[in-house]
């Protein structure tokens, strides 16, 4: 289902300083492997010097590992242990052994001290290593660190092997979706920019494709009878195949793709439908298709898909919740204020698995008003997937390169409330603690676009570590009242 997301094969390398018992490090390595219950490849080479380091890296490469745990079973050899990250092409986590599994004479490893030298040497060599919040622990503790590291590594590997394919340019008066490509290259992401006309030519070339009937049947099965426009299926299936073939034919040296596509105003009339439902289907398979050529929205979605190993979406931070609705359905039932809530909306790109059971393919009301005759039945503005979003824990986040070329990000955890919106599109009532202050002093103050990515679960801890590893210096979050923002007026 998620062929567009990396599979992490994790290797475990133990290191040992030659003045400490090597057997201590090896015993502790074996205990970690046992605690992981087969979830890691245990490298048999213990690293004491640079030649050992080269042998260990060759061994984990031969085993197919694409991420590593470098384990300081004792103080560790600071030069060879840190050079592992230079010679191994993948993310490395550095962790250290806690004492307590032996006496404090021959059984003391001093890895607590060795981790300091490890960090110092990584810095001197300008090498990146992931170090957990508290990197010292027992075998069971480190097994838990490893379980957190796997989705982090998945996202890092994905980003380093990602190509974002765009069909644009962005709609007029949509400068909020600006996307300086400098930040993409800093992150190691490739981008292929195409015109909407390129997409149309490819779409027309897929007319009569022999695979269309099978895709139509899959769409029927997904939606259920009465939940789709039968006369639209072939057009939408043709478009889905167009995108999938383009991804396969254009990913080039990269392994993974995401799209950022123009979807209005010309698209519906020229293609004959709105692309939202098709976009939602690709997103459910780990291939984000960001609306309105939002390149950093696509990147954000892809990172969230890697971390959560689940479908994600991209929504407008759209409208306030009416006070009357808050009073009737939220106040007293949930521990939120009115300004903690807002509605997240998009025309219809959220995967069906994240919507309420009454979801259906409908038409885009705003585009119908704009593009089709008043009073007419919707025609080419059909194709949106609409319903209230199902109640869920969520993480609202974004990684963005701003107009000055600086990478910034934000992360806020909250939930989608089980409250009917009474509105149209793919829409839900979101609640995030202290959203009002976050909205003013992060989203507005730092000039973020109106699109935010949504992961369906609480993934703030993992996203924070990924953004930090990628070198993002500004990682904002919804700060509690006890921690004012720098721009917050203390007299207000």
Residue ranges and their predicted role:
Residues 1-36:
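N-terminal basic/disordered segments at the start of proteins
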Residues 365-492:
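Extended hydrophobic packing segments that form well-structured cores
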Residues 53-65, 84, 242-252:
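Short, well-structured alpha-helical segments in soluble
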